[in-house]
Each structure stands twice: as structure tokens, then as C-alpha cells.
Amino acid sequence: MKLRDKWKIYLGLTTIKVQCPCFFLFHNDENRTTTSNLDSVKSKKKRRKTISDASIVSNGSLVSHPSIDKGKLSILKRYKMSHRLTAIDKLRPLTVLVAWKQLNIAMRPIFPQHRYTEQDKKNWKKKVIIEDLNFLVLRCICACEAISDFEELLGNMRIGLIIDISLLGMNSNESSFLHYLVEVWSIFYLEILPYIEATFLPVTFAKFEIAQLFEEPMKTYWLKKSANIDLKLFSIWVFRKFVVMPKLKKTNRFIEIPQLNTQQQILLVQMISIISLIKPQDESEDLLMNWLNELTLKFLYV
């Protein structure tokens, strides 16, 4: 064999059978056919598209990034898991309850009622990392062993959002109900809602590439089934049902209209226009919404 051919074999530029004993340094089987480096790279890329549940739990988190060319979600990338989560998993096995508790604790800084100190109020965004929250949501899905576990997980998610959103105004010092609604709405819509949508991205946008992360067909089916969940619409409904309506029921109909600046007026109109998109569940809610609309119209045209 010529020296040039030997170099081609070493660089992987040809495909022939090699009988040389030194070939064992590169392959275990002397009769195995060598392949090009380009083909091996392609095969590795194909294998990375599907990641098992075990690798998600043990190796790291996954997060989606927008593609520059097509503007869609690109293939999800893995992130290294924090030492804190690794230590917890070593102490006790991962279950749906344990995974949900970890996610619930990690989401607390998003809501103002869980920011106890001045430092928490100023630096709460530094404690909230969307990639870690996405990873914790995937851990919850990995811990599910049946469709009943997955449905229970979705139920816990709804209950948790209802509790946290309904307590948004507990620290408000505004005496006027319109000032109160404007203040709470600005916090909810501008700060909290984007984080809620980004956190539960693996559940709400499974139709893109999230479902490909699971090798088990059933878990892929669960995620595709949950793709109809509109967490933004659900969160807005919770805000209207448990924040706006209780405040309106306690307000005197003949109350004097307070003064609002331009920014507050914009927020008030925005809130009413958005929460009015959801159909009232009963007649009392319909009456309260009509009264709020009339009051706002009078206020704007005074």
C-alpha cells in the first residue's frame, strides 16, 4: 500500500477495508469499514435531536431560542444542571410532587407578595432564570408515569396560578379602587404575565420541538394534547375573577371618580379592553363589567 493511501485512511478520506494491526488503535473490529468524518458528524447531529427523560433529569435543562433564518424555535439546547438540584435528587428520588415543589419555590420571586425584603424587591429578576424554570417544568413532566399524573400536574399548575395571582394586591396601599386596579394591573400584565408564559413554554408550545425531547410516545402525546392550553388567557381570567371582581363588589356605585394621570388612564383602558374579551360566567359579573365600562367612559370624557 502506498504512503498516500495510508494517509487517506488515517484522515478518513476513503472507504476501504484495512487489515493492518495498527488499525485497532482507531476501531475495535479490523473488518469494520471506515467512514468519512463528515458522515460521522451528521450521524451525531441526528442522534442529538431525541433526548431521553433520563438525560433531561441527569444532565441538564433545555431551552428554546428563536432561529435567525426562519424565525421559529430552533433545536433545544442542553444546559448544565445546578449543584443544588443535583444534591436534592441524590437525597430522594424524583417524583411529581418533589418536582412540582421545586418549580413552585423557584417561581416565587415572580410574584410581589413573596418579595419580603428591599433587596428582594430590587433584585428579584436576577433570581428568576427562565432556562432553569423551563428545566423544572420538564422535570415535572419526566416524573409523570401515567396520564393521570400529567393531568394532576396541570391541575396543580392552575391552582398555583390562581393562588399567586389572587394575592397580587395584598401589599397595595391605594385607597381608591381605580388606582388599586391600575397599580395591580401594571404589575400583572407588564411584569408577571411574560414570566408565566415563558416558564410554561414546554407545556403550551409543544407543537414545535418540545415533544421531540421524549422518546416515550405517550409523553409526546400528553404534550401535544396540552398544546391547546392558553396560559395567558387563563391568567387573565384569574385576574378578572379573583382580583377585579372582588374589588368591584366592595365598591360603592356612587363613589367619586378619582383623578388619574395619562399613564394610569392608558393602563385602565388597556385592562378593561383585555379582560372584557373573556365572556362573563354569570349575570353578576356581566353587570359589574358593564358598570366598570360605563364608569371608565364617563371618566375619560369628563
From Swiss-Prot:
Cross-referenced Pfam families, in alphabetical order? HbrB
Q: Where is the signal peptide?
A: none
Could you mention a single GO BP entry for this protein? TORC2 signaling
Q: Which GO terms describe its cellular component?
A: cytosol; nucleus; TORC2 complex
This protein's source sits in the domain of life called Eukaryota
Q: What is this protein called?
A: Uncharacterized protein C6B12.03c
Query: What taxonomic ancestry is recorded?
Result: Eukaryota, Fungi, Dikarya, Ascomycota, Taphrinomycotina
